[in-house]
Amino acid sequence: MRRLLALLFCLPALAQVPAEDSRNTTIPNTDTHFTPRAYKTLGEWEARRTHLRKQILSAAGLLPMPVKTDLHPQIFGRIENSDYSIEKVLIETLPGYYLGGNLYRPLKPAPAGGFPAVVSPHGHWNYGRLEHTTVASIPARAINLARQGYVVFAYDQVGYNDTIQTPHDFGGPKEDLWAFNPLTVQFWNGIRAVDFLESLPGVNRNKIGATGASGGATQTFLLAAVDDRIQFSAPANMISAIMQGGAECENAPNLRVDTFNVEIGAMMAPRPMLMVSATGDWTKNTPSEEFPAIRAIYALYDKAANVETLHLDAPHNYNQQNREAMYRFFGAHVLGDGDATHFKERSIRVEKLQDMLALHNRTLPAGALTFDGLFAEWVQRAKAQTSAIRDRSTLREMLSYALLADWPAEVISQAAGDQVVLSRPERGDRVPGIWIPGKGAAALVVAPEGAAAARKSPEVAQLLAAGRPVLMIDAFQTGTAVAPRDRSGKFFTTFNKTDDANRVQDILTSLAWLKAPNAELIGIGKAAVWCLFAAAVAPRPVPLKADLGGFTGADQDYLDRFFVPGIQRAGGFEAARLLAGK
């Protein structure tokens, strides 16, 4: 597998236009071996962290954050043991959609300021949040944390236990347009789980943490990356440079374009984090590779002591030895108790499944939605939210992150006669074209068949007759830029932009190369839609001529003519028209 250096490419100091377009040759997937990028200053890292946070939120359909509605918490079925209690929980994380879980609380009086609290997502274990084996036990970790003085909410992955209004794996191209997928719902559930803990009496809102293993660790470090309320964490057996997650709930389009889990995990810095790893899974290199990279980020904050690692000779797990390391780490950083002997795991009473399941002999509340109803509710709420936004910079940011498009500060080029090739330094892309100099306002003409077809068009003939300078390009996968692109890797769109999103980028790159504030953008045929969205996200006004040919922004229009995941959630056609002045 091709190793990605510095996340993407290492080019010579003197940047040159590459011979091949890296978007066709360097195609990462969940099993690619990534190499962490080095950051020299805290400011450089903080800028990257801000960008990644918005990218993650956009990929999850949470940019902007949906309006939070009342959780209507139902807490019932209390079980009391000698020093802790367990209760069943249902909370309404979206109108008509319910997340199930169990709430574990200490029976001793709350200290001044309240108990610290922990959200406890689970991995892909057979019994979900009720898994209790030597390899992993969610009840054991929750009960022992409660005994140590934490309030713990162990909640379901989508499609597990009591959270059954969607399957665990769902969605397709239409849902992708609206950024509605298992990761979206699960991520949102995690945010609302923190809201739930904050709302409880006796909880210290300033001391909330998270821990989970495997898929639960993915939820843990993603939540910590975007929610600063997570003050301490222990993602177990997941942060890796060689495997990024194999389940739908860990992947969404755009989530890891130009990034990967080590960088996302480092976003926890400088808050305390324990990295648990094992020789028998994809975290086998943690002591020598992933941990040093993340510790280097902590060192930028002068907080290298806030991140630790435990590496076991074991298979994929969250076993007792790992859990005890987590108890000790949390004890030292949260409880102020550095005595490891205080954090030995004690045996637990295993409750009957029916005594733990919120929906045992119980139905979902009235008004609970079907899957189709939930998707319709998501779409309706997204439309209402985005249509109310009139701030142009907010809309432009939303569309830019859906497209993952940027206006390059520098564009390099090489020319031979009227043939030109453009590229963004250190990105490895290529934009071939035809450049005909002239006088007056420059024009960029984009045709779906490429530059040669544009050269023969009436639009270009008219421009040349007027003596104007004209650039015609082979946008990504058009004209001479057509090339094999292997899309067979796992979760292709999680790691790679779609062809249409790349075409928008090529248009922006070309406009930036022209360096003409009044350059006109002309889109022919299907390329008119590409040009509309490029003009919409450009940081300056772009005169646009584009006959959209009946494109109205319906879902089917995007599926047929402009497939970009998340584009509808980001405001879609109406936002683009507003920004482009069409």
What residues fall within each predicted segment?
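Alpha-helix capping and helix-loop boundary segments enriched in small/acidic/polar residues
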Residues: 130-137, 174-188, 210-221, 251-264, ...
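Sec-dependent N-terminal signal peptides
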Residues: 3-12
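Cap/lid segment of the alpha/beta-hydrolase catalytic domain
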Residues: 110-199, 238-249, 443-513, 552-561
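Generic beta-strand/beta-sheet core signal
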Residues: 104-106, 121-122, 155, 211-213, ...
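Alpha/beta-hydrolase-fold serine-hydrolase catalytic core, especially in secreted/extracellular enzymes
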Residues: 16-98, 276-441, 449-469, 476-517, ...
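Primarily recognizes the serine-hydrolase "nucleophile elbow" in alpha/beta-hydrolase
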Residues: 195-257, 510-581
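Loop/turn elements at helix/coil->beta-strand transitions in domains of secreted/extracellular proteins
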Residues: 114-117, 148-151, 204-207, 228-232, ...
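Catalytic-domain carbohydrate-binding cleft regions of carbohydrate-active enzymes
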Residues: 207-250, 254, 258-301, 306, ...
